[in-house]
Amino acid sequence: MDQNGASGSHPNRLSQGRGAHARERGATVSAAANRSNIIDEMAKICEADRQTFAIARRTRGHERLAVDNSDFVAVEDLILSYAEPTPEDQVEMIMSDFCSSPTYAEDEDEPSHESEPWFRFRNKRIRTYSRKRDPKSHKAVQNEKRRGSSGLSVQRDLNTSFTSMACDFDASSQKIHEVLLNLSQYFSATATASGPTPVPSQIDLPTEARQDSGDECFNAELENLRDDLLQSGFTFEASFYENEHEQEGPGTMADTIYGDSMQSVPTTRLRLESGKRNVWSDADSTLKKADVEIAENKKLLMGQTQAKNVDIEENTNFILEGIPLSEWLTPMELPEISKDVIKHIPDKKLKLEPSSQKEQKSSKDSNASKVRGASKQSCDINTKNEGTTILDQPNAAEQENLLNDGELLEEFLFNDWQPMQCSNGPSTSKNAIQGPKENINSINLDDKEQPEKQTPNKSQTISSHQLNGIRKKSFKFIEVSEEMKIKGEEFVDKVVSGLYHFSHKCNLRTEEYSDNHSQVMESTQCAEFKSAPSKPIEILDGKETYNAIAKVDVGEINGKFSPLNNDTIAEPEFCGFRTASNKAIPISEKMKIKTAEFMAEFQSKETIQQNDYLVHQPNDKPTSVGLDTALKRSIESSEEMRSKASKLVVVDTTMREPHQPTLDPVCRDLNESQFFGFRTASNKAIEITEAMEKRGAMFLAQSKATDQLNGWQPSDFPDVLPTSPNNEIHSINVENNKAVNTKTVSETEFFGFRTASNKGIVISENTKIKVAQFMSEFQAADASTDSNQPTVISEESRNIDAKFVDEAAAEDSANKPTFCNVQSLKNTSDIEHFKHDFFVEHSAKEEHPLCSQPLVRTPRRSQEIHSSLSQLAGKSPLDQATKKSVIARRNLLSLKRKRKIILSTETSTSCALPTMERFAPKPSSTSTPLADRDLNRSKDCTKNRQDAEDMSPICMQPKKSRRLGLSRSRY
């Protein structure tokens, strides 16, 4: 049984092993299949990722128009979107924004002594305004005081970087910061340790300007300029200061934004060439105090005293101290030796010697010229004091060569010349100078006896003392011709003799000056005049120049000094006018005759205008008066005009004597040519015919009659006008100083009104009837007012009144009756009836009790009232004239409406007194036309009101709300 069990168990084991192997194999196959599926999926994912990345690269830079179908996001996009910036990137961005320049490249060889950061202003110094640097020994004490200062101080944070300080403080904020620090330091210094900070009564701030800001001329600019000068090849001398840092003084340094201090530049000014020196004006130095400190430092360091000579150079602490940089950019000329300014000029005496003596000593061969300028004199200068002289030359030989006329006069300053008067030329001064005539004559004789000398060429030396002719400032000779020499001699003789002749009269006044000026007169001669740039002026020959100068000098001398002798200068008789150049205008006899005729005619015309005198002249055109026109054209005058002018003068004299009734026989001849009429602007007579005379008489008569008719009252008209059957009336007699009876003028009978142009207004029969009815009603109203009794008006009169009101309203429109002659009035009975009904008797007006009281009635002239209220839209409601017209128009419209209501009623009791209501006074009202305020209609209107829903918002009535305060509703 064991064998069977053993043999039976072996196939079972095989089957089990096969099953296990099959299961393992299936697991491996399934695992391999799963691996292949994962690889395929990864491949698909990579392919999708590749495609999405390619699409993202193509669409990068612009917005995607459509959303992706899948929700897949590329890894690169995630990295770029979620990457955080590093501190290095932020620093690079800030440096590129603020410290980079597109046109600037950094140097590779960066200097080691400059502090970071590097930016485009590396080689430039920023101007800063800092306080004075205190000595190093007191820095710790001041820092302790700052920590305990008051709340007004603004402390600088020591932990902040220099770059932030540069960004925070500019020029203006630095100045404010500095002022606050000074105030804080002042309050902290005055505070006591025990008690609180006391409040001082006043703050003693420094009044002088800051030395470190103006006097240092901005150390940054100085250093830059120093570098530029060193590059250009300039060299500076060694400094007198050995220890620069130890000898730092307060107020000489300035802090930069990087904390490093600007070192002083221990250099001196450049030494100029020998014979030249720097001359600076007072404006070049900015602060006097700095100059004093520099001078003291130099004395301590050098140990030597300053020499008296001005040529010794001043050594300064800085180069270009006190001189702005802008002044060095412009070229500057060094001052010449001859133009140096000497502040203390010693007293000098000028001794003038004749040039003839000098000429004999220097050169015997040279001869004096005939024409010699005023500068042809040599001068010796003797000084009293031992001070500096204007010219200091070592050799006497060089001094003799250089002291010629031109250079000698150039070396003198303008203020060195003492005022001195010379009598060798025309003088414009008021002081008379007298010189001996013998000396003058001797001078002239000597000049004439001297031989002529040739004009020097340009090749001659300038240092020679002799000069023939006139010389410019640039040492160029001017040739003088023989004619000019002769004219000059004659002119000098005339002027000198004339001056001597006139100055002899003032001998007593000028005795003290005779000795000095006699010497000058002997050695000086006047050649000719010179202009401002020393150019010669040609002298006119003849006696005109001499006479003009003599007259000027005589006038000046006679104006100041009274002559001893009673000799008067005979002036020529003057008759006429003078021009602007003081030239006499000759007046001939012909001009005198024309002027006399013109004055006679002018006086006669003026007399005629004043006395209203008419001169009759013939119609033919007379000749003109002999005067000159504006174009200097002569106007011929005839004998007839002269005779008329003489007659007019006689008439003028006779008219001024009213007590002599008889006229001169010459005036009787004027009746030959009678003149009656007017004249034109050109003095032409206007002929007046007989027809014009008749028209004028008719016009005067008619105007007088019109004035009388306008002045009459209605009660002054007579009942019947005297008329003839042929409709002819007599004109009114017009009296003008005498009764003039004019002849009767046949005209049509006139009765009615006239316009402003004297045209008749037509009055029709219908108008007459209406006016008569109107006046009857008016009289009836006045009578009823007197008796206070009601009057009954018939139905016929009411209808007529209604028609009259309607027609009157129609007449208010723009259509007005036309104007024409009053020829339609033929029946005199109608005229009498119209006049009788139109005018009110004067006695009735006096008996009326209400006539004396001003009544407000409807205006009678309805055509002057505005036809509608729309015409008042553009006018102000506050205008009084507009307000009155509105009230009058409203009263007229209400009158018509009431008349229609009264006429439409059946009973006559309701309208018992229509005339009283019509002419009754109306109460005053405002200019705004209001609606009808009938109490009976208000109740009916409430029933017919529409609901608010049915009405439009425009037509809806405003809701009345209760108003508080002082406001009132208008209605």
From Swiss-Prot:
Residues 1-15, 375-392, 420-432, 453-466 have a biased composition (Polar residues). Disruption phenotype: Viable but female sterile. Females lay weakly ventralized eggs that fail to hatch. Induced sensitivity to DNA damage induced by irradiation or treatment with hydroxyurea/ Repair by homologous recombination is dramatically decreased. Instead, large flanking deletions are formed, and repair by the non-conservative single-strand annealing pathway predominates. When combined with disruption of Hus1 females do not lay eggs and have reduced size ovaries with apoptotic egg chambers. Residues 130-139, 959-971 have a biased composition (Basic residues). It is found in: Nucleus. GO terms for cellular component: nucleus. The keyword Acyltransferase does not apply. BRCA2 repeats lie at residues 570-604, 671-705, 746-780. One of its GO terms (biological process) is meiotic recombination checkpoint signaling. Involved in and required for double-strand break repair by meiotic and mitotic homologous recombination. During meiosis, has a dual role in the repair of meiotic double-stranded breaks and the efficient activation of the meiotic recombination checkpoint. This is Breast cancer type 2 susceptibility protein homolog.
